[in-house]
Amino acid sequence: TRIKAVLVDDKNQPIASGAHEWENRYENGVWTYSLEDIWTGIQDCYQDMAKDVKAKYDVELESVGAFGVSAMMHGYMPFNKEGELLVPFRTWRNNITGEASEKLMELFNYNIPQRWSIAHLYQAILNGEEHVKDIDYIATLEAYVHWKLTGKRVLGIGDAAGMFPIDTTKADYNQEMVDKFDELVAPYGFSWKLRDIMPKALVAGEDAGVLTEEGAKLLDVTGKLKAGIPMCPPEGDAGTGMVATNSVAVRTGNVSAGTS
């Protein structure tokens, strides 16, 4: 699998790119990537693209008009108030939430696949995992990266729908189901309610923040990249694939044969 960075011009034509090879690990019965894997991969990928820009155009890459982050959907990255990851990233590839998935399907009368973030959260609760009481934020991979680059806890609606069911009339999490979940876990006495710990769902074009000074240094280890670049809502690979193949118009569709 590769992490990819693509620079496009004002006509949406690719003009430079970079890549980094990475592979998930199977540790303690869980498919995962470490935070180090994530950031060394992103940084290496960005540098590869910056070198391509320098080689092709003899220009140092210092800013772009706008950018966004896309990554694998679903999964589970719970953080505490200090921003520390409480358990290793549980990716979409894990099938370890069968009990939670079944019970939530019954509760919501709605299909909840095992890979969805809400299934991971409820399974951790059913397992009696210590970390759940300390959760301050739950993210998917791109929600996490976007948060670190902008400070904003937001997620594009395509992958928000891979965390929890969406009310399509409101373009937001289904409030009736949110209430049912909060009621379901109330006996455990957690300090949080579900909406407190989930990223805000955004639709395309909404303000998702700008690259911060801290985020710029995280992305470009050489320090050349400038802060202040607007960022679009981060999205899952399915929605990104549809946009990239122009399959967003009515009566069009796309078939993914692997996301990379």
Where are these regions (language model features)?
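Glycine-rich phosphate-binding/catalytic subdomain of phosphoryl-transfer
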Residues: T32, D44-S260
